[in-house]
A protein has these predicted regions:
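Conserved RNA-binding domains used in RNP assembly and mRNA/RNA metabolism
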Residues: 24-125
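Bacterial N-terminal signal peptides
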Residues: 9-23
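Positively charged n-region of N-terminal signal peptides that target proteins for export
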Residues: 1-4
Length: 125
């Protein structure tokens, strides 16, 4: 009886340690994943559109690419905006997405919180 009790306590203790780690791993999205969306900037992503920024500020251009580049020149960061889920992701490797400003892309990488560590970027369409 005592041996079974010790075994059950050990199993319970191990479960209490391992289960939160598994949940954290799932939540953080460890492992390579694929993300799709438009390479936008941190000024325009809250609205999910460049239209408001282009209407408010002159010199932002008349298309997504020009607006994104102009916002980044003002100090904004490149972001990935998933139009389907309305999710905004930060991008750790800004240089890897810069040439895709204002374009729809597929990013392969790992997710930690809402930040993508970019491995590869391909333009869609």
């Amino acid at each position: 009886m005592k041996k079974r009790f010790v075994c059950n306590i050990s199993t319970l203790a191990l479960s209490l340690l391992v289960l939160p780690l598994l949940a954290l791993s799932e939540q953080s999205g460890h492992g390579v994943q694929t993300f799709t969306g438009e390479v936008m900037d941190s000024i325009c992503t809250p609205s999910g559109s460049h239209a408001a920024t282009m209407a408010k500020m002159s010199g932002m251009g008349k298309d997504s690419e020009t607006c994104t580049k102009a916002c980044v020149a003002l100090g904004a960061k490149y972001m990935l905006y998933d139009q389907t889920s309305h999710t905004v992701y930060s991008v750790n490797q800004q240089d890897k997405v810069a040439r895709f400003a204002g374009h729809d892309v597929r990013i392969t990488g790992t997710l930690a919180g809402n930040k993508i560590d970019v491995r590869d970027v391909d333009e869609l369409g």
